[in-house]
Amino acid sequence: MDISIISDKNNPLLYRREIKFTVSFDAATPSIKDVKMKLVAVLNADKKVLVVDTLDQIFGKLEAEGYAKIYNDEKAMATIETKSVLEKNKIEEEAAEAEVAEE
């Protein structure tokens, strides 16, 4: 999976960076969680404040266009983003921590 950044714009009014990107892949369209983790690595961002808003498949190509936001802090993200978008981007950290605690 390769990610290329189309635009990276700072939006100080909403305390965030807005990123438009394309994702190239070999098989099925990657999940939002997979794209989010790849963006965290590419942009060197904190996964707690990065939100993948949209990920749209381009018809007939093994590519998808996406829109992500990186907030300055979690408080701004919780105030501005809708609950559905936050749930869609939630990473199951609690489940991973529970597995470690059981061992």
From Swiss-Prot:
- Keyword field contains Ribosomal protein: yes
SUPFAM superfamilies for the chain: Ribosomal proteins S24e, L23 and L15e
* Keyword Ribonucleoprotein annotated: yes
Alphabetical UniProt keywords:
Ribonucleoprotein, Ribosomal protein
* Any one GO cellular component localisation term in the record: ribonucleoprotein complex
Q: Name one GO molecular function term.
A: structural constituent of ribosome
Q: Which Pfam families match?
A: Ribosomal_S24e (PF01282)
Example GO biological process = translation
Q: Which family does it belong to?
A: Belongs to the eukaryotic ribosomal protein eS24 family.
Put simply, this protein is called Small ribosomal subunit protein eS24
Species of the source: Methanococcus maripaludis (strain C6 / ATCC BAA-1332)
